[in-house]
UniProtKB/Swiss-Prot annotation:
Catalytic activity: (6R)-5,10-methylene-5,6,7,8-tetrahydrofolate + glycine + H2O = (6S)-5,6,7,8-tetrahydrofolate + L-serine
Quaternary assembly: Homodimer.
Family listed: Belongs to the SHMT family.
Pathway(s): One-carbon metabolism; tetrahydrofolate interconversion; Amino-acid biosynthesis; glycine biosynthesis; glycine from L-serine: step 1/1
Highest taxon of the lineage: Bacteria
Cellular localisation: Cytoplasm
Protein name, entry field: Serine hydroxymethyltransferase
Enzyme class: transferase
Binding site for (6S)-5,6,7,8-tetrahydrofolate: L121, G125, H126, L127, S355, P356, F357
Native source species: Shewanella loihica (strain ATCC BAA-1088 / PV-4)
The protein's Enzyme Commission number: 2.1.2.1
NCBIfam families membership: PRK00011.1
GO cellular component: cytosol
Short name of one Pfam family: SHMT
Organism placement in taxonomy: Bacteria, Pseudomonadati, Pseudomonadota, Gammaproteobacteria, Alteromonadales
Amino acid sequence: MLKKEMNIADFDPQLFQAIQEETRRQEEHIELIASENYTSPRVMEAQGSQLTNKYAEGYPGKRYYGGCEHVDIVENLAIERAKELFGATYANVQPHSGSQANSAVYMALLQPGDTVLGMNLAHGGHLTHGSPVNFSGKLYNIVPYGIDESGKIDYDEMERLAVEHKPKMMIGGFSAYSGIVDWARMREIADKIGAYLFVDMAHVAGLIAAGVYPNPVPHAHVVTSTTHKTLAGPRGGIILSAANDEDLYKKLNSAVFPGGQGGPLMHVIAGKAVAFKEALSPEFKEYQQQVVVNAKAMANTFIERGFDVVSGGTENHLFLLDLIAKDITGKDADAALGRANITVNKNSVPNDPRSPFVTSGLRIGSPAITRRGFKEAEAVELTNWICDVLDDINNEATIERVKNQVLELCAKFPVYG
């Protein structure tokens, strides 16, 4: 018999210590990685529930195993809430990740060798949008589009490439783009050549749910997202559509199961259901509004301090800091800030002369700092500390001073109070 008082601390002290140290790191470090966030204790409660024990291959009402009457309720709650949140008529909440959601879309809509128009990874796209090291770049003929000299998506180039190459699918969405995407313009281009429009909104899903960023669901044939990042739920993926095309919906479902996955993770789907309910609240909208305010405040402060922000600012939760003019590598900047308890990620910038393992930039995002309660004043103060470190990157005294300031600020704004 399994006893409820069983715990990790007594059974596996080594693992328990690692978990405790990570918990402390999250409380004592400022998190600026744009794709990271803090999920609620309610979501973690769902993920730690006995739902983890249940296999449920198939879909609600059409399972291959018995005993699914309760997990059917859980999955249907997640589906209906996702549809309400994004104005969709179809939702699949089973993908284990955003990348698996994306691979299901490829499988549902394309054949290997088909042409796909996707955003260049070096210009802000994602691995699954056609990078040669990813399945998408290996199995499909990828035509990349990018940004213009101002740092904005070049829709004229996109249209020219679409007309020239006639892709079967166009991809919108990004992992490092700070502007507003014109989903309607992309759909016009797709319709002009008879292509599917697939949007990966993983980075801005929370902003979209709160109405502070344009919703691609009314424009795209199919939309995918992660459920963490700005949405602040458990790590996982979803697929959405408002195309009112039952044949398309069947293809998407089949591409997830049995095409790409077996049993869904019912404890994670429960966490998704909780997160979607949280995202339907007025408090969530206020949070997302503050995310954008904080990101803009940070970008503006960097510019005032003489740093180069790609595209000159941000309209969402993230931006890229171009360090070429400062002659600092992203790798060195990442490491120096890490010693000051500020977590960022090195990132390639447009026309980056350095390798992806070194880079010339940083990607900075505001979702996590906003989640722990930072407002504009704290965002500006933090940005000035970052500038202090980067302006004198080898000065360990400055790094130590900033680290102490970070620890004081973190103590005032605990992640989990």
